[in-house]
A protein has these predicted regions:
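Short alpha-helix boundary/capping and kink motifs at helix termini
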Residues: 2-135, 139, 145
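Basic- and aromatic-enriched surface patches that contact anionic nucleotides/nucleic acids
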Residues: 9-14, 18-21, 129-206
Length: 206
């Protein structure tokens, strides 16, 4: 079986993809040459564009932290894949412990283009001791705080390896709530947060 390499595009400028999909971080390239994009169109549905050959792999990669997206359609409206919905519940914003210290201003600007109300914010969380830990969606959470939302929507999922470490490091830096995360320029974010993550995961290989 041929190995499949999936690269998720983390920039906001790429002529191969729609801007809306780029803003949602729903763009991928398989084996360096096959472009795919997934564009969320409602709270539980998305459109997928690209060669049908790798649909399953792209959808599975996309849903790693987006299990609330359960219906995937082709561009002509054909249902491609359907999943069982997770249990979604209201969660007070001030009860969430982040696993991230910083927010990228450029990503925040992108998120503002598609987050307009509470219903647009559904994030994966894990129970940790007596708290809920946010596993993804920190930019959306920060925007919720800035918009004055008192709660968002969430679903329980499995924590990732190293969750304990990221929680500990967040608290050590005084990041104990969504409002404590620090907004940085895109350049500073890459230098501080990306570097921190790279060094952590590199240490696991030693």
């Amino acid at each position: 079986m041929n190995e499949i390499n999936i690269q998720r595009i983390d920039t906001y400028e790429d002529e191969r993809f729609d801007q809306e999909a780029l803003n949602q971080h729903g763009c991928f390239v398989v084996n360096g040459k096959f472009p795919y994009q997934i564009k969320i169109i409602s709270k539980d549905s998305a459109l997928i564009k690209g060669e049908e050959k790798y649909y399953n792999e792209i959808i599975n990669d996309f849903r790693f932290f987006a299990e609330h997206i359960i219906n995937f359609y082709s561009m002509d409206g054909k249902i491609i894949k359907k999943f069982k919905p997770p249990t979604i519940f209201d969660l007070d914003l001030d009860k969430i412990q982040p696993t991230q210290f910083y927010i990228d201003r450029k990503k925040l600007d992108a998120v503002k283009t598609f987050v307009k109300n509470k219903e647009d914010i559904i994030i994966p969380v894990a129970k940790y001791e007596d708290q809920y830990i946010s596993l993804d969606g920190h930019t959306r959470l920060y925007l919720a705080y800035k918009l004055g939302f008192s709660f968002i929507y969430a679903f329980i999922t499995k924590s990732f390896d190293g969750t304990d470490y990221f929680v500990k490091e967040s608290k050590k830096r005084g990041v104990k709530a969504v409002k404590d995360m620090i907004l940085l320029s895109h350049e500073d974010y890459r230098q501080k947060w990306d570097k921190f993550c790279d060094e952590y995961f590199a240490s696991l290989e030693n």
